[in-house]
From Swiss-Prot:
Keywords: Ribonucleoprotein, Ribosomal protein
Pfam families according to UniProt: Ribosomal_L33
InterPro entries with a match to the protein in the record: Ribosomal_bL33, Ribosomal_bL33_CS, Ribosomal_bL33_sf, Ribosomal_zn-bd
Recorded name of the encoding gene: rpmG
Keyword Ribonucleoprotein applies: yes
GO cellular component, one term: ribonucleoprotein complex
GO terms (BP aspect): translation
Signal peptide: none
Molecular function terms from GO: structural constituent of ribosome
Presence of keyword Ribonucleoprotein: yes
Name the UniProt record assigns to this protein: Large ribosomal subunit protein bL33
Highest taxon of source: Bacteria
Organism (species): Alkaliphilus metalliredigens (strain QYMF)
Record-stated family: Belongs to the bacterial ribosomal protein bL33 family.
C-alpha cells in the first residue's frame, strides 16, 4: 500500500517535497539528498508526518 509522505529540510525545517512510498518495502523513515530553495543548496531531507 502506497502512502503519501512529506520531506522536510533538516537545516531550515521547511517542508519542500511531497511524494509516495511503499510501506511494505520501506518501513523506516526516508532520508534523501534534495535541493532546498530556501537554503539554496542540497541538504538532507527527512520524512515527516
Amino acid at each position: 500500500m502506497r502512502v503519501k509522505i512529506t520531506l522536510a529540510c533538516t537545516e531550515c525545517k521547511q517542508r519542500n517535497y511531497n511524494t509516495t512510498k511503499n510501506k511494505k518495502n520501506n518501513p523506516d523513515r526516508m532520508e534523501m539528498q534534495k535541493h532546498c530553495k530556501f537554503c539554496k543548496s542540497h541538504t538532507l531531507h527527512k520524512e515527516t508526518k
